[in-house]
């Protein structure tokens, strides 16, 4: 059995100095000798702590503007030396054992994210000595504790107090894992950055410099293991980005209910990202990653009521997302009316949570407020590869629209068109959305033929007794033939919004003119597969 190891000497060298003085003081008061470098050493000395500069310890000064500080046998021998095996040779060369290394690395990611960052700026923020110490300490975790996260400081002090100044093997091993994850992520960032410069430096034109690196290195942290994946015979886990700040299903806090399933997370993501499109109080109900009801109103209660009416059958067992706080009245309406898997909102009132708590199977997530959409990448796994693209954050405003028919849309039709265009972006292709008065009337999703999606949207509306006449229709891509317009006219659609771009646009526009339909082109497609 591995024994706890005492911590008598610690080397501290950090770029992010948050909490380091308090941590160093806690170590010092517990009899730990402090070694440090450069700015960290000065900070500790200014705080009145007894600290030995690494250059004084090694007898070798920092040089080359700080590029060489800790790359010395007395440092790495003290870290890598195996207690009980290398003691004699360490004593022979006056190498003192270092029991703890506290390091975080130069801020490479923050540097290259700054506007105007040059290659020289990036190069000077590539840490060499730091990762070397981190890897050395992690390799010798049997004897040495490596600390790379300030969030671990408090727990480490607590354990030292509980174990007479020692840390257990389990703790050292866990810290070593974090250390290797830390250096792997750091090296990945550097590789991605340099790889993204290849087009610029090699004269290639296949991709803009700074977008897609030659080799893509990804780092995600496991948030939870799952009972199973999309189906019960598939194992699964949920991984998240470490530094994500945007309100999302990945950063949401679950305040009620049993663990989220694989499908819960996928559907909740679809619902939340859709509801983010709206600035007014909105509700989105999703089933199998497709919106089955969306509405905007003066309150989330009314928005929910109207979204539910689009397709009550599909809403059963669905995911509900709001862009305002979940209040008690809305919570009561939901649990009284339907079975729901997940409710997600920026926040939830205490009274609302008391109501949802009566339904133990209802999962409630709060994700915080959002201000704007954050650019990023989307991934699609194919056998043997990975498709990577920008997130679809494309939006259109009234100023971007082109009316291509003889009849101009009314103000109401224009509002309805923009509303259902936002919804269509989140419906699986081929996608058709009927809407009127900021409420979806019918949604046709995922059909191989666009005209059948249009027909399904009409059937859905008819099944629920919703009046289609006078509604707007959105299509996520162009109409290849006029049949989709004929189908829309047959149920009373009076305005169509679509990207345009078909070789038969003239025929499609002529069909709209024949039926007296106003047609708007967005010149932007929203395929979703």
Swiss-Prot record:
Domain comment quoted from the record: The IMP cyclohydrolase activity resides in the N-terminal region.
Signal sequence, renumbered to the chain: none
Stated name of the protein: Bifunctional purine biosynthesis protein PurH
PANTHER family to which the protein is assigned, alphabetical: BIFUNCTIONAL PURINE BIOSYNTHESIS PROTEIN ATIC, BIFUNCTIONAL PURINE BIOSYNTHESIS PROTEIN PURH
Alphabetized GO MF terms: IMP cyclohydrolase activity; phosphoribosylaminoimidazolecarboxamide formyltransferase activity
Gene Ontology biological process terms from the UniProt entry: 'de novo' IMP biosynthetic process
Chain's gene name: purH
InterPro entries cross-referenced by the UniProt entry: AICAR_Tfase_dup_dom_sf, Cytidine_deaminase-like, MGS-like_dom, MGS-like_dom_sf, PurH-like
Pathway the protein contributes to: Purine metabolism; IMP biosynthesis via de novo pathway; 5-formamido-1-(5-phospho-D-ribosyl)imidazole-4-carboxamide from 5-amino-1-(5-phospho-D-ribosyl)imidazole-4-carboxamide (10-formyl THF route): step 1/1; Purine metabolism; IMP biosynthesis via de novo pathway; IMP from 5-formamido-1-(5-phospho-D-ribosyl)imidazole-4-carboxamide: step 1/1
Domain of life: Bacteria
Alphabetical UniProt keywords: Hydrolase, Multifunctional enzyme, Purine biosynthesis, Transferase
Family the entry assigns: Belongs to the PurH family.
Entry's EC annotation: 2.1.2.3, 3.5.4.10
Catalytic function, reaction form: (6R)-10-formyltetrahydrofolate + 5-amino-1-(5-phospho-beta-D-ribosyl)imidazole-4-carboxamide = 5-formamido-1-(5-phospho-D-ribosyl)imidazole-4-carboxamide + (6S)-5,6,7,8-tetrahydrofolate; IMP + H2O = 5-formamido-1-(5-phospho-D-ribosyl)imidazole-4-carboxamide
């Amino acid at each position: 059995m591995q024994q706890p190891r005492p911590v008598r000497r610690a080397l501290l060298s950090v770029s992010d100095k948050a909490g380091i003085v308090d941590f160093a003081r806690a170590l010092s008061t517990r009899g730990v000798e402090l070694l440090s470098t450069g700015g960290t050493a000065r900070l500790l000395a200014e705080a009145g702590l007894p600290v030995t500069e690494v250059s004084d310890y090694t007898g070798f000064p920092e040089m080359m503007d700080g590029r060489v500080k800790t790359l010395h046998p007395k440092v790495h021998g003290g870290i890598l030396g195996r207690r009980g095996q290398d003691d004699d040779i360490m004593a022979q060369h006056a190498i003192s054992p270092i029991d703890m290394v506290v390091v975080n690395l130069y801020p490479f990611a923050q540097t290259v994210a700054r506007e105007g960052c040059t290659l020289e700026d990036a190069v000077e923020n590539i840490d060499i000595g730091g990762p070397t110490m981190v890897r050395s300490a992690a390799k010798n975790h049997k004897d040495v504790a490596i600390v790379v996260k300030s969030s671990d400081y408090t727990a480490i002090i607590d354990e030292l107090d509980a174990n007479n100044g020692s840390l257990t093997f389990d703790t050292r091993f866990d810290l070593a894992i974090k250390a290797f994850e830390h250096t792997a992520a750091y090296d990945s960032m550097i590789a991605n950055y340099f790889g993204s410069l290849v087009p610029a430096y090699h004269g290639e034109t296949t991709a803009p410099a700074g977008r897609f690196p030659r080799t893509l290195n990804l780092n995600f942290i496991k948030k939870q293991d799952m009972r199973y994946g999309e189906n019960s015979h598939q194992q699964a886990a949920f991984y998240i980005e470490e530094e994500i700040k945007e309100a999302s299903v990945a950063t949401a806090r679950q305040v009620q209910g049993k663990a989220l399933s694989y499908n819960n997370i996928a559907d909740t993501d679809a619902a939340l990202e859709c509801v983010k499109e709206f600035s007014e109080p909105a509700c989105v109900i999703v089933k199998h990653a497709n919106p089955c009801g969306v509405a905007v109103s003066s309150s989330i209660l009314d928005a929910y009521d109207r979204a539910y009416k689009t397709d009550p059958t599909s809403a059963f067992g669905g995911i509900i997302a709001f862009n305002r706080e979940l209040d008690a009245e809305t919570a009561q309406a939901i649990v009284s009316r339907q079975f729901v898997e997940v409710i997600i909102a920026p926040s939830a009132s205490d009274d609302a949570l008391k109501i949802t708590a009566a339904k133990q199977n209802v999962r409630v997530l709060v994700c915080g407020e959002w201000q704007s959409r954050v650019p990023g990448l989307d991934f699609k796994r194919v056998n043997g590869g990975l498709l990577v693209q920008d997130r679809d954050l494309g939006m259109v405003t009234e100023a971007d629209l082109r009316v291509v028919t003889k009849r101009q849309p009314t103000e109401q039709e224009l509002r309805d068109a923009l509303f259902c265009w936002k919804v269509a972006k989140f419906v699986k292709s081929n996608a058709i959305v009927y809407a009127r008065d900021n409420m979806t009337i019918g949604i046709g999703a995922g059909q191989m033929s666009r005209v059948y999606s249009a027909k399904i949207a009409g059937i859905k509306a008819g099944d629920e007794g919703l009046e289609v006449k006078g509604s707007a229709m959105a299509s996520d891509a162009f109409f290849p033939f006029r049949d989709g317009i004929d189908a829309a006219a047959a149920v009373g659609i009076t305005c169509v919004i679509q990207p345009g771009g078909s070789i038969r646009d003239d025929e499609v526009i002529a069909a709209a003119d024949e039926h007296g339909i106003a047609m708007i082109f967005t010149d932007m497609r929203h395929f979703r597969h």
